[in-house]
Amino acid sequence: IFSPVVLTVVSVATAAMLALTSVLCGCSSNAESSSQSGSTTPATVATDTTVKTTGEKIHINDSTLGEIWITELDGVPKNTLNNDNFTSDDTFKYYSENGKAASMEGIDISSYSGKIDWDKVKKSGVDFVMVRIGGRGYGSDGKMYSDDSALSYIKGAKAAGLKVGVYFFSQAVNNDEAIEEADYIKTLLGDETIDFPVAYDWEIIKDDDARTDSVSAAQATACAKAFCNRVKELGYTPIIYSPSKELYFKYDLTQLADFDIWYCEYANVPTFYYQF
Protein backbone atom coordinates (compact mmCIF):
# COMPACT_ATOMS: atom_id res chain seq x y z
CA ILE A 1 0.00 0.00 0.00
CA PHE A 2 1.18 3.53 -0.59
CA SER A 3 3.29 4.21 2.47
CA PRO A 4 2.79 5.60 5.07
CA VAL A 5 -0.99 5.22 5.04
CA VAL A 6 -3.24 2.26 4.49
CA LEU A 7 -5.63 2.63 1.58
CA THR A 8 -8.94 0.82 1.76
CA VAL A 9 -11.07 0.44 -1.35
CA VAL A 10 -14.74 -0.41 -1.69
CA SER A 11 -16.79 -1.00 -4.84
CA VAL A 12 -19.47 1.25 -6.28
CA ALA A 13 -22.54 -0.49 -7.71
CA THR A 14 -24.60 2.63 -8.34
CA ALA A 15 -24.23 6.32 -7.58
CA ALA A 16 -22.96 6.87 -4.05
CA MET A 17 -23.92 3.34 -2.97
CA LEU A 18 -20.81 1.99 -1.28
CA ALA A 19 -20.66 -1.74 -0.62
CA LEU A 20 -18.78 -2.88 2.48
CA THR A 21 -15.70 -4.89 1.65
CA SER A 22 -12.37 -5.58 3.23
CA VAL A 23 -8.97 -4.10 2.68
CA LEU A 24 -8.68 -3.28 -1.01
CA CYS A 25 -11.37 -4.97 -3.05
CA GLY A 26 -11.22 -6.24 -6.62
CA CYS A 27 -11.51 -4.80 -10.08
CA SER A 28 -13.72 -5.58 -13.06
CA SER A 29 -12.66 -7.31 -16.25
CA ASN A 30 -14.00 -7.41 -19.79
CA ALA A 31 -13.60 -10.65 -21.71
CA GLU A 32 -13.50 -9.37 -25.26
CA SER A 33 -14.04 -5.81 -26.44
CA SER A 34 -13.02 -3.75 -29.41
CA SER A 35 -10.16 -1.44 -30.26
CA GLN A 36 -6.49 -2.39 -30.23
CA SER A 37 -5.19 -5.78 -31.34
CA GLY A 38 -2.76 -7.80 -29.22
CA SER A 39 0.91 -8.24 -30.04
CA THR A 40 2.03 -11.65 -31.24
CA THR A 41 5.77 -10.98 -30.99
CA PRO A 42 7.35 -13.60 -28.71
CA ALA A 43 10.76 -11.90 -28.64
CA THR A 44 10.56 -10.87 -25.02
CA VAL A 45 9.23 -14.05 -23.46
CA ALA A 46 10.92 -14.60 -20.11
CA THR A 47 12.67 -17.80 -19.12
CA ASP A 48 12.35 -19.44 -15.72
CA THR A 49 14.80 -18.35 -13.03
CA THR A 50 15.54 -19.62 -9.56
CA VAL A 51 13.45 -17.81 -6.96
CA LYS A 52 15.49 -16.67 -3.98
CA THR A 53 14.09 -18.06 -0.71
CA THR A 54 15.18 -18.42 2.90
CA GLY A 55 14.18 -22.08 2.80
CA GLU A 56 11.84 -21.63 5.76
CA LYS A 57 8.34 -23.09 5.43
CA ILE A 58 5.55 -20.76 6.59
CA HIS A 59 2.02 -21.91 7.47
CA ILE A 60 -0.69 -19.44 6.46
CA ASN A 61 -4.45 -19.42 6.92
CA ASP A 62 -5.47 -17.48 3.83
CA SER A 63 -9.08 -16.27 3.65
CA THR A 64 -9.36 -17.34 0.00
CA LEU A 65 -6.92 -20.23 -0.39
CA GLY A 66 -7.45 -21.77 3.03
CA GLU A 67 -4.57 -23.28 4.98
CA ILE A 68 -1.44 -23.33 2.85
CA TRP A 69 2.31 -23.64 3.24
CA ILE A 70 4.68 -21.28 1.44
CA THR A 71 8.46 -21.12 1.26
CA GLU A 72 9.52 -17.73 2.60
CA LEU A 73 11.02 -15.41 0.00
CA ASP A 74 14.42 -13.93 0.74
CA GLY A 75 14.52 -10.17 1.22
CA VAL A 76 10.80 -9.50 0.75
CA PRO A 77 9.46 -7.38 3.67
CA LYS A 78 6.77 -8.98 5.81
CA ASN A 79 3.33 -7.53 6.52
CA THR A 80 3.61 -5.59 9.78
CA LEU A 81 0.04 -4.26 9.99
CA ASN A 82 -1.54 -4.85 13.39
CA ASN A 83 -4.92 -6.53 12.89
CA ASP A 84 -6.14 -5.04 16.17
CA ASN A 85 -5.83 -1.59 14.60
CA PHE A 86 -8.55 -2.26 12.01
CA THR A 87 -12.05 -0.96 12.71
CA SER A 88 -15.10 -0.66 10.49
CA ASP A 89 -18.53 0.90 10.19
CA ASP A 90 -21.42 0.17 7.81
CA THR A 91 -19.43 1.42 4.83
CA PHE A 92 -15.68 1.47 5.34
CA LYS A 93 -12.84 -0.26 7.08
CA TYR A 94 -10.25 1.93 8.80
CA TYR A 95 -6.70 1.53 10.07
CA SER A 96 -5.11 3.55 12.87
CA GLU A 97 -1.72 3.80 14.54
CA ASN A 98 -1.15 5.22 18.01
CA GLY A 99 -4.77 6.30 18.13
CA LYS A 100 -4.53 8.35 14.92
CA ALA A 101 -6.01 7.63 11.50
CA ALA A 102 -3.51 5.98 9.18
CA SER A 103 -5.76 5.09 6.27
CA MET A 104 -7.52 6.63 3.31
CA GLU A 105 -10.81 5.34 1.94
CA GLY A 106 -11.47 4.80 -1.73
CA ILE A 107 -13.56 3.15 -4.42
CA ASP A 108 -12.69 1.33 -7.63
CA ILE A 109 -15.09 1.80 -10.52
CA SER A 110 -15.71 0.91 -14.15
CA SER A 111 -18.44 1.61 -16.68
CA TYR A 112 -20.51 -1.07 -14.91
CA SER A 113 -20.88 1.40 -12.03
CA GLY A 114 -23.25 3.56 -14.07
CA LYS A 115 -23.96 7.20 -13.37
CA ILE A 116 -22.21 8.49 -10.24
CA ASP A 117 -23.06 11.50 -8.09
CA TRP A 118 -19.52 12.57 -7.25
CA ASP A 119 -20.55 15.13 -4.65
CA LYS A 120 -22.36 12.37 -2.74
CA VAL A 121 -19.30 10.14 -3.06
CA LYS A 122 -17.08 12.86 -1.63
CA LYS A 123 -19.48 13.62 1.22
CA SER A 124 -19.69 9.91 2.09
CA GLY A 125 -16.05 9.97 3.19
CA VAL A 126 -14.31 8.70 0.07
CA ASP A 127 -10.82 10.14 -0.41
CA PHE A 128 -9.74 8.61 -3.71
CA VAL A 129 -10.97 6.75 -6.77
CA MET A 130 -9.34 4.06 -8.92
CA VAL A 131 -10.94 4.13 -12.38
CA ARG A 132 -10.73 1.32 -14.91
CA ILE A 133 -9.12 2.95 -17.93
CA GLY A 134 -9.33 -0.17 -20.09
CA GLY A 135 -8.11 -3.71 -20.48
CA ARG A 136 -7.21 -6.58 -22.76
CA GLY A 137 -9.56 -9.42 -23.64
CA TYR A 138 -8.57 -12.88 -22.49
CA GLY A 139 -9.55 -14.52 -25.80
CA SER A 140 -6.93 -15.69 -28.27
CA ASP A 141 -6.72 -12.39 -30.18
CA GLY A 142 -6.16 -10.37 -27.00
CA LYS A 143 -7.76 -7.16 -28.20
CA MET A 144 -7.31 -4.12 -26.01
CA TYR A 145 -10.33 -1.99 -25.13
CA SER A 146 -11.04 1.32 -23.45
CA ASP A 147 -13.59 1.90 -20.71
CA ASP A 148 -16.06 4.32 -22.28
CA SER A 149 -16.83 6.00 -18.95
CA ALA A 150 -13.25 6.41 -17.74
CA LEU A 151 -12.53 9.98 -18.75
CA SER A 152 -15.90 11.30 -17.57
CA TYR A 153 -15.38 9.51 -14.24
CA ILE A 154 -11.89 10.98 -13.90
CA LYS A 155 -13.10 14.50 -14.64
CA GLY A 156 -16.09 14.18 -12.30
CA ALA A 157 -14.05 12.78 -9.44
CA LYS A 158 -11.40 15.47 -9.77
CA ALA A 159 -14.05 18.19 -9.87
CA ALA A 160 -15.42 16.85 -6.58
CA GLY A 161 -11.98 17.11 -4.96
CA LEU A 162 -11.11 13.40 -5.02
CA LYS A 163 -7.70 11.96 -5.81
CA VAL A 164 -7.73 9.76 -8.90
CA GLY A 165 -5.74 6.80 -10.21
CA VAL A 166 -6.46 4.25 -12.92
CA TYR A 167 -6.18 0.50 -13.42
CA PHE A 168 -5.82 -1.66 -16.52
CA PHE A 169 -7.07 -5.23 -16.73
CA SER A 170 -4.12 -6.99 -18.35
CA GLN A 171 -3.92 -10.31 -20.13
CA ALA A 172 -0.42 -9.77 -21.47
CA VAL A 173 1.46 -12.92 -22.42
CA ASN A 174 4.86 -11.32 -23.07
CA ASN A 175 6.80 -8.17 -22.26
CA ASP A 176 5.93 -6.47 -25.54
CA GLU A 177 2.22 -6.71 -24.79
CA ALA A 178 2.72 -5.39 -21.26
CA ILE A 179 4.58 -2.36 -22.62
CA GLU A 180 1.90 -1.95 -25.30
CA GLU A 181 -0.72 -1.78 -22.54
CA ALA A 182 1.18 0.92 -20.67
CA ASP A 183 1.48 2.98 -23.85
CA TYR A 184 -2.22 2.49 -24.53
CA ILE A 185 -3.04 3.92 -21.10
CA LYS A 186 -1.04 7.03 -21.94
CA THR A 187 -2.93 7.34 -25.23
CA LEU A 188 -6.28 6.99 -23.47
CA LEU A 189 -5.42 9.54 -20.78
CA GLY A 190 -4.03 12.06 -23.24
CA ASP A 191 -3.53 15.33 -21.38
CA GLU A 192 -5.73 14.24 -18.46
CA THR A 193 -3.67 14.24 -15.26
CA ILE A 194 -3.97 11.84 -12.34
CA ASP A 195 -2.45 12.01 -8.88
CA PHE A 196 -2.75 8.36 -7.81
CA PRO A 197 -1.03 5.37 -9.40
CA VAL A 198 -1.55 3.42 -12.59
CA ALA A 199 -2.36 -0.15 -11.53
CA TYR A 200 -1.43 -3.33 -13.40
CA ASP A 201 -4.30 -5.79 -12.90
CA TRP A 202 -3.20 -9.16 -14.33
CA GLU A 203 -5.39 -12.00 -13.13
CA ILE A 204 -5.76 -15.75 -13.51
CA ILE A 205 -9.00 -16.35 -15.41
CA LYS A 206 -11.39 -18.73 -13.69
CA ASP A 207 -14.09 -20.93 -15.26
CA ASP A 208 -13.03 -20.25 -18.85
CA ASP A 209 -10.14 -20.82 -21.24
CA ALA A 210 -7.78 -17.84 -21.49
CA ARG A 211 -4.79 -16.80 -23.57
CA THR A 212 -2.81 -16.49 -20.32
CA ASP A 213 -3.42 -20.07 -19.12
CA SER A 214 0.08 -21.21 -20.11
CA VAL A 215 1.94 -18.10 -18.94
CA SER A 216 4.66 -19.15 -16.50
CA ALA A 217 5.34 -17.46 -13.18
CA ALA A 218 8.60 -16.12 -14.61
CA GLN A 219 6.77 -14.59 -17.57
CA ALA A 220 3.97 -13.15 -15.43
CA THR A 221 6.61 -11.49 -13.25
CA ALA A 222 8.47 -10.17 -16.29
CA CYS A 223 5.24 -8.72 -17.72
CA ALA A 224 4.52 -6.91 -14.46
CA LYS A 225 8.03 -5.45 -14.41
CA ALA A 226 7.87 -4.40 -18.05
CA PHE A 227 4.51 -2.68 -17.55
CA CYS A 228 5.55 -0.90 -14.36
CA ASN A 229 8.89 0.26 -15.74
CA ARG A 230 7.17 1.66 -18.82
CA VAL A 231 4.56 3.40 -16.66
CA LYS A 232 7.40 5.08 -14.75
CA GLU A 233 9.01 6.17 -18.02
CA LEU A 234 5.69 7.75 -19.00
CA GLY A 235 5.70 9.84 -15.82
CA TYR A 236 3.17 7.93 -13.71
CA THR A 237 3.50 5.93 -10.50
CA PRO A 238 3.01 2.18 -11.09
CA ILE A 239 1.40 -0.26 -8.69
CA ILE A 240 0.54 -3.96 -9.00
CA TYR A 241 -3.00 -5.03 -8.17
CA SER A 242 -3.38 -8.64 -7.11
CA PRO A 243 -5.15 -11.09 -4.80
CA SER A 244 -3.12 -13.57 -2.79
CA LYS A 245 -3.18 -16.46 -5.30
CA GLU A 246 -1.25 -14.54 -7.93
CA LEU A 247 1.07 -12.98 -5.35
CA TYR A 248 1.98 -16.33 -3.82
CA PHE A 249 2.04 -18.54 -6.91
CA LYS A 250 2.32 -16.41 -10.06
CA TYR A 251 4.63 -13.52 -9.14
CA ASP A 252 8.22 -13.68 -7.92
CA LEU A 253 8.02 -10.87 -5.37
CA THR A 254 11.81 -10.81 -5.00
CA GLN A 255 11.87 -9.23 -8.48
CA LEU A 256 9.06 -6.75 -7.83
CA ALA A 257 10.51 -4.97 -4.81
CA ASP A 258 10.57 -1.60 -6.61
CA PHE A 259 6.78 -1.52 -6.93
CA ASP A 260 3.98 -1.17 -4.39
CA ILE A 261 1.24 -3.78 -4.13
CA TRP A 262 -2.48 -3.01 -4.23
CA TYR A 263 -3.66 -6.08 -2.40
CA CYS A 264 -7.15 -7.53 -2.82
CA GLU A 265 -8.80 -9.56 -0.08
CA TYR A 266 -12.42 -9.89 0.98
CA ALA A 267 -11.95 -10.45 4.71
CA ASN A 268 -12.21 -8.65 8.03
CA VAL A 269 -8.43 -8.31 8.25
CA PRO A 270 -5.68 -8.96 5.69
CA THR A 271 -3.99 -12.36 5.86
CA PHE A 272 -1.25 -11.81 3.27
CA TYR A 273 2.21 -12.66 4.62
CA TYR A 274 4.21 -9.96 2.84
CA GLN A 275 4.12 -6.17 2.90
CA PHE A 276 1.59 -4.41 0.68
Each language-model region and where it sits:
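Sec-dependent N-terminal signal peptides
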Residues: 2-17
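Hydrophobic faces of well-ordered beta-strands that scaffold small-molecule active sites
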Residues: 105-109, 129-131, 164-168, 198-200, ...
